[in-house]
Each structure stands twice: as C-alpha cells, then as structure tokens.
Amino acid sequence: AEGITITSQCIRVPVLNGHTATVFVKFRKNPTKEQLIEAMTSFKGAPQELGLPSAPKQFIQYLEEDNRPQVALDVDFEKGMGISVGRLREDSVYDWKFVGLSHNTVRGAAGGAVLCAELLKAKGYITKK
C-alpha cells in the first residue's frame, strides 16, 4: 500500500511448527482498528482470485482474544496455508502493532512451493511439453 512503513521482528522459539512475528506499522493516513481488520480479513490475492487448489479460501483471519494467535491453537488455520493475526493495538511510535502467525513448514515451505507452482501454471509460465 502506498505510504505504509512496516518493521517487524521474528523470534525463534522451540515449537514444532509456526512462526510468530510482531509487526509495527505506520501509515500516512492512520486508519481505524475496524478499517485495518476489514482490510486484512477481506484481502484476496491472485491465488484466491484464481481459486487455486492449495490457496486458502480466507488468507488472513483476525482473532479478537487478547492472547491470540497462539501456535497450539491457530497454526493450522486453513490447513496451515492461512495467516492468523491478533493483538492489534495502537502504538506510540508507529500507528499500530499486531502479532501474526504462519505455519513455517506448510505455508512457508512445502505448501508454499506447491502454491507457487499452481500460480505459475495458472499464469502460463508452466506448460505441458
């Protein structure tokens, strides 16, 4: 998005699956919390628009609970291909901060690679010989 500044930090913790990131965001025009949640949860990228088999139907879910997302509870959202976001709060330096969770081996590796191949095929970059 135009005029957006983002910083983030990922801390590796001993869990079987899942990467958690704390993200700090600054906008030129500060949106409301409701606008941010709507933008995240309604986002659809090319994989969703093309209806690719490995694409999650809902790419990002927002969790209202103060202690979410959590690896044990949320890492398998959309069979591990979706992103869970929560703890959206105003920030005194940036405009907003939130926590994001993704499945590192499904979304980040194997499933992500399959989804990339599906997208390349759908866009005509991979064809039969």
Regions found by a protein language model. Give the residues of each.
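C-terminal substrate-binding/catalytic lobe of Rossmann-fold NAD(P)-dependent oxidoreductases
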Residues: 1-95
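Generic C-terminus detector
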Residues: 95-129
